[in-house]
Amino acid sequence: MPSLRSRFFVFLLRHRHLLRFKLKRRNNIDRDTPVQQLRDEVERSAGFFGKLPEGFTVTPVSIHGISAEWLMPPDTPKEKAILYFHGGGLVIGSAKAHRGIVAKFVKGSGVGALVFDYGLAPEHPFPDGLNDSVSAYQYMLDEGIKPENIVFMGDSGGGNLCFATLLALKEQNIPLPAGAVTLSAWTDLKNTGESFITNAESDNLCWRDAQEIFRAYYCGDNDPGMPQISPLYGDLHGLPPLLLYAGSDELLRDDTTRLAARARDAGVDVTLHVGEGMFHCYPACAPLFPEATEAMNEICEFVRRRLNEIPYPVPNSPLNPLSNL
């Protein structure tokens, strides 16, 4: 059963329009909705996920014209790192807006992260974002970071690019990273999962109309069933160990559960967590309720183990770095 704190949090999510003195839960999104307006809203709400811990540094870099930044904890070399694919339906979001989220993973795992601003649709439809993602990984390799010292991580639309990049790297015979973590990855842009229908009302963060519009922006004239657009339909053999999260009540739940099943059938080491009563990308909300904190701890331990770091402290340990976030 979901914790009392998580249920209260979900209640606030569902009724947050009332806190803004609005009667309507949400505004419909269609092709007439200004994309920049949606992006501005994301940037304004970024602070909700927390601020950078003391001593963290943000170092901007340019990767063949792609804006990116290193997010580093104090006194940490770049020998091992996370490559983070930010979410936002492939249309909104940014590295800057995700600093608070990524900082939690960085703090808990003890390694830095490279976060990059891949090209967003509709200005940059497929394959621009995927090409930028491959370039970001190649940049890390060119910087001398070994593949076995890199873990991919992505949320929502960034989870899509995380898997699509793995497939592209495999096709190009580029060594794969040590592992990958996704939160509520959008793996099927055909939107055929049962949860896309059954959870349309229970999902308080993702909306079917928005997903359809974002899909059209990203795919352009391309078939949404192409494996590098919808990794669910790709050849998953040979992928590194995966740690996957989804909420039971979210629109994209089945995008994760179906990919997990197909990856296992392909012989991939998969750990799947479907949080009961949870919502889209719920681990990013740590430490606001127990389920998110537990997931965050598991993710950080996975990163440390894949990178052969010291095992992460058990939940509720006095050494738990999330206790100070």
Question: Can you name each region flagged by the protein language model?
Answer:
Residues 1-71, 308-325:
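A glycine/proline-hinged amphipathic helix-loop "lid/cap" segment
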Residues 59-325:
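Alpha/beta-hydrolase superfamily serine-hydrolase fold, recognizing
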